[in-house]
Amino acid sequence: MNIKKVDKYSFLEFKDDKFSLYFSTAENGLNFNINTEEGNDNIRNLKDWFNVKDVGYLKQTHSDIILNYDSDKELLEGDALITDKDNTLVGVFTADCVPVLLYDKSKNVMAAVHSGWKGTSDMIVKKTIIKMKQEFLSTASDITVYIGPHNKACCYEFGEEALSEFEGSGIYDISEIYKDGKLDLEKCIVKQCKSENVNNIKCLNICTNCSKEYKMFSYRRDGKSAGRMFSFIIKK
């Protein structure tokens, strides 16, 4: 992992052949909340900062809607974007939910997924992998998955009354994903990947709520004043 500096801001950077993956931090208050003028300005800046033609993102709704990215002319609702377009960036906004970036070097396809507890219970990452297989002919062994900073099991308190959403999936063992009143979203997502025979999984192991090494936004910690981070993948 590298730290990419852009102006006064810091991004966590990973590179693999033609793919570059970035996770923004809250360093110097870099905010991508699209409900603010500042957030929209920063989204527009990404084209110059990272030298790309198109920037793809969605109006996130905690759904399992997965869309193929075509252009940035219209803001659509959903929580995952897939594309094989060159010189393009696709990403998701988070402030505790899990950003998941996927790519397949063989078929030159990439995806960005926003997986909060609802999206995780609806298995949006698994469904994204299935869509990559069906529509872009990806094979499991060619897919790489990065699980970014989120509210990890050390901090993510979750009410037992909603655990029923995770039962009956056939891949979750509640005793493994839920302990001492806390839910392990990362473990859920890893299980989704492995259920599709995707085993090349990289976990950043950064908690948005309690990380001391990196400055992160956390809605649980900071409330409505929390900014939004942007996690994205580029194919050149």
Curated annotation (Swiss-Prot):
SUPFAM superfamilies, per the entry: CNF1/YfiH-like putative cysteine hydrolases
Subunit structure: Homodimer.
Similarity remark: Belongs to the purine nucleoside phosphorylase YfiH/LACC1 family.
Cofactor(s) annotated in UniProt: Cu(2+); Zn(2+)
One Gene Ontology molecular-function label: oxidoreductase activity
Chemical reaction(s) catalysed: adenosine + phosphate = alpha-D-ribose 1-phosphate + adenine; S-methyl-5'-thioadenosine + phosphate = 5-(methylsulfanyl)-alpha-D-ribose 1-phosphate + adenine; inosine + phosphate = alpha-D-ribose 1-phosphate + hypoxanthine; adenosine + H2O + H(+) = inosine + NH4(+)
Top-level taxon in the UniProt lineage: Bacteria
EC number: 2.4.2.1, 3.5.4.4, 2.4.2.28
Record key words, sorted: Copper, Hydrolase, Metal-binding, Oxidoreductase, Transferase, Zinc
Protein name: Purine nucleoside phosphorylase CA_C1699
Sites where the protein binds Zn(2+): H62, C97, H114
